[in-house]
């Protein structure tokens, strides 16, 4: 009887955590990424929202039909300014600064930035569609000196975590306003 009660508590607690973290997940997958003519560095990607494929262009809104949670994905924005994506040290430093100083969730909206040079061919990034959960995850990454955001495999993370990547969250007042280059 005690075992049943223990399992029941674990299931309820797990459901509470899942609800608290937003419930929905979306995955950015780089395997089908191709060049785009939209802008010199723009790219397109595939995104899965709860296993439903969605095609991404330079600026795409992802909306969960059964909730008010929403994400805007902005591809190929280099961080920091005037730093090439090949400059891993400067790139990581800029990412950490922006995560620490600039990211602000707006209600249930999350903004993502990224560059195709960051995700390896077979890597993908899955994040909860929840500003609070995303903020905590990004802040924990930014404060971990052993886990740089270059997308390299040098960062050792538990098997339950996703590979490192350079995609970060970024708040903007308007979805039409792209970050300054």
Curated annotation (Swiss-Prot):
The chain crosses the membrane at residues 4-24. It is found in: Membrane; Host cytoplasm. Keywords: Host cytoplasm, Membrane, Transmembrane, Transmembrane helix, Virulence. Disruption phenotype: No visible phenotype in a 12 hour, calf ligated ileal loop infection model. No bacterial growth phenotype; bacteria no longer induce IL-10 induction in human B cell lines. Bacteria grow slightly less well in human cell lines 24 hours post-infection. Deletion leads to greatly decreased phosphorylation of STAT3 in infected human cells. In mouse infections (C57BL/6 and CBA/J mice) deletion mutant bacteria are less virulent and less competitive with wild-type bacteria, mice have a reduced bacterial burden following intraperitoneal or oral infection, while mouse STAT3 is less phosphorylated. Induction: Expressed during normal cell growth and in bacteria growing in a human cell line (at protein level). Transcription activated by SlyA, which is dependent on PhoP. It comes from the Bacteria. The keyword Transmembrane applies. A Salmonella strain-specific effector that induces a host STAT3-dependent anti-inflammatory pathway. In bacteria-infected host cells (human) leads to phosphorylation of host STAT3, at least on 'Tyr-705' and interleukin-10 (IL-10, IL10) production; expressing the gene alone in host cells induces STAT3 phosphorylation and IL-10 production. IL-10 production requires STAT3 in infected cells. Contributes to virulence in mouse infection models. Encoded in only a few S.typhimurium serovars, it may be a specific effector for adaptation to bovine hosts. Interacts with host (human) STAT3. This is Salmonella anti-inflammatory response activator.
């Amino acid at each position: 009887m005690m075992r049943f009660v223990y399992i029941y508590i674990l299931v309820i607690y797990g459901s509470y955590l899942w609800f608290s973290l937003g419930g929905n997940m979306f995955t950015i997958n780089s395997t089908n990424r191709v060049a785009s003519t939209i802008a010199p560095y723009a790219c397109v990607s595939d995104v899965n929202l709860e296993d439903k494929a969605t095609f991404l262009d330079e600026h795409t809104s992802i909306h969960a039909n059964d909730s008010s949670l929403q994400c805007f994905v902005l591809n190929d924005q280099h961080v920091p300014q005037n730093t090439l994506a090949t400059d891993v040290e400067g790139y990581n430093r800029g990412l950490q600064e922006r995560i620490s100083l600039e990211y602000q969730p707006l209600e249930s909206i999350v903004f993502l930035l990224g560059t195709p040079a960051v995700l390896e061919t077979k890597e993908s990034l899955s994040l909860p569609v929840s500003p609070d959960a995303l903020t905590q995850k990004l802040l924990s990454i930014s404060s971990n000196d052993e886990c740089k955001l270059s997308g390299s495999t040098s960062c050792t993370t538990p098997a339950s975590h996703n590979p490192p990547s350079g995609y970060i969250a970024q708040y903007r007042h308007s979805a039409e306003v792209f970050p300054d280059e």
